[in-house]
């Protein structure tokens, strides 16, 4: 009997349909909220830092896009902006900062040096931070214009909104045989 039913589609019950519908609404709502509340952690190492400060100034106003308040603790941030060149001695530090960030977390490679090592093609420079940590958005330029950075933030916002977000990740509790009282 079970082998006859293996190829048939499983029909969802009303409760499963309701839970799926509710999860879809929660996911869309969380995606919308998260895309406008990015808490950045700037990892600034080189000359692109000047353009990072320009991007955060009143003229370009990154606050409009929800990325205004830089955090100086990775535990309070969800967007790591790697700004500039990363050398091999800094690589473990960058990886540790990434691991300290709470989930969900995103990474932006700010400038050519962070994206591909730039013109520092030598043994001491990491040829792109994607060799150390996963990168969500690459912003080109040496240094990138503030408009390019804001475009990168908008691309990241689209990515965040289209991701699946869960309010609570429920996992079944383990059953312990012969526990207390048995």
Curated annotation (Swiss-Prot):
It catalyses: a quinone + NADH + 5 H(+)(in) = a quinol + NAD(+) + 4 H(+)(out). PROSITE patterns: COMPLEX1_20K. It is found in: Cell inner membrane. The keyword DNA-binding does not apply. Its EC number is 7.1.1.-. Its cofactor is [4Fe-4S] cluster. The keyword Protein biosynthesis does not apply. Binds 1 [4Fe-4S] cluster. GO terms for cellular component: plasma membrane; respiratory chain complex I. Pfam families: Oxidored_q6 (PF01058). [4Fe-4S] cluster binds at residues 47-48, 113, 142. InterPro entries: NADH_UbQ_OxRdtase-like_20kDa, NADH_UQ_OxRdtase_20Kd_su. GO terms for biological process: aerobic respiration; electron transport coupled proton transport. It comes from the Bacteria. One of its GO terms (molecular function) is quinone binding. Keywords: 4Fe-4S, Cell inner membrane, Cell membrane, Iron, Iron-sulfur, Membrane, Metal-binding, NAD, Quinone, Translocase, Transport, Ubiquinone. It is a peripheral membrane protein. NDH-1 shuttles electrons from NADH, via FMN and iron-sulfur (Fe-S) centers, to quinones in the respiratory chain. Couples the redox reaction to proton translocation (for every two electrons transferred, four hydrogen ions are translocated across the cytoplasmic membrane), and thus conserves the redox energy in a proton gradient. NCBIfam families: nuoB_fam, PRK06411.1, PRK14817.1. Belongs to the complex I 20 kDa subunit family. NDH-1 is composed of 14 different subunits. Subunits NuoB, C, D, E, F, and G constitute the peripheral sector of the complex. This is NADH-quinone oxidoreductase subunit B 1. The lineage of its organism: Bacteria, Pseudomonadati, Myxococcota, Myxococcia, Myxococcales.
């Amino acid at each position: 009997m079970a082998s006859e039913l293996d190829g048939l589609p499983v029909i969802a019950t009303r409760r499963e349909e309701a839970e799926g519908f509710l999860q879809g609404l929660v996911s869309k709502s969380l995606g919308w909220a998260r895309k406008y509340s990015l808490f950045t952690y700037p990892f600034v190492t080189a000359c692109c830092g000047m353009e990072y400060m320009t991007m955060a100034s009143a003229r370009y106003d990154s606050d409009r896009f929800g990325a205004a308040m830089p955090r100086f603790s990775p535990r309070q941030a969800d967007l790591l902006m790697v700004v500039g060149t990363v050398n091999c001695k800094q690589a473990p530090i960058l990886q540790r900062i990434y691991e300290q960030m709470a989930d969900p977390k995103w990474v932006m490679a700010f400038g050519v040096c962070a994206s591909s090592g730039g013109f520092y093609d030598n043994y001491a420079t990491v040829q792109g931070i994607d060799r150390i940590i996963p990168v969500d958005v690459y912003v080109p330029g040496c240094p990138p214009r503030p408009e390019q950075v804001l475009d990168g933030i908008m691309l990241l916002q689209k990515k965040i909104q289209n991701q699946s977000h869960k309010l609570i990740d429920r996992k079944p509790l383990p059953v312990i045989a012969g526990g207390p009282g048995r």
